[in-house]
């Protein structure tokens, strides 16, 4: 598969060190670049029959509520400010009781704002939410964020900026091949930034090396710097 990343928010392209916004370079990579096998995440929502694929991140809770609360019409009027408006609304919602299972190992029920499961770890602005995530390691990386106050959000921000993974109950990390999230109440969910509505359960697995994608050649001039 070749990528033509024209938008600033193309997180897969950014995680693969692709050039953003230059269609001629992107087309050259798509035609002449190196093949790289990357993992594909699959999510089964509640009792639905079909899995849905994701390549970057899936989320339940606050991050998905931001996506759901910023529809196209609002983004057309406000631009990026739409996400701040949506995020403020989502902050008013209570934390959710969630049970998490990683490779069948059940973690205690916890109150969280959001749980993000990622195949990649890098966000916009160079922030890294999942420091250990690798797009081809056959693992899904998980982070739960459970702040209940402004002070808690400052802890989250500090942990993300410094990429610290251990030592605080508000920000916790795991890795595994299968992830199960069960929420006590319906929560907004998203796959690769697309809101998919409210869910109570999401089961995810990784399909290692399932997708061949064209990337810049090693040492070539088409890589992002």
Question: Which residues fall in each region the model found?
Answer:
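Catalytic core of DAGKc-family lipid kinases
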Residues: 2-113
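Glycine-rich nucleotide phosphate-binding loop and flanking beta-alpha elements
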Residues: 10, 121-123, 187
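Short glycine-/acidic-enriched loop or helix-start segments at secondary-structure transitions
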Residues: 12-14, 126-127, 154, 191
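Short beta-strand-to-turn element immediately C-terminal to the catalytic PLP-Schiff-base lysine
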Residues: 43-44, 69, 117-118, 143-145, ...
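Glycine-rich phosphate/pyrophosphate-binding beta-alpha loops
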Residues: 59, 63, 116-130, 195
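Gly/Ser/Thr-rich active-site loops/lids in small-molecule metabolic enzymes
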Residues: 74-82, 117, 123-125, 131-152
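ATP/nucleoside-binding phosphotransfer catalytic cores, i.e., glycine-rich phosphate-binding loops
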Residues: 102-109, 134, 140, 144-225
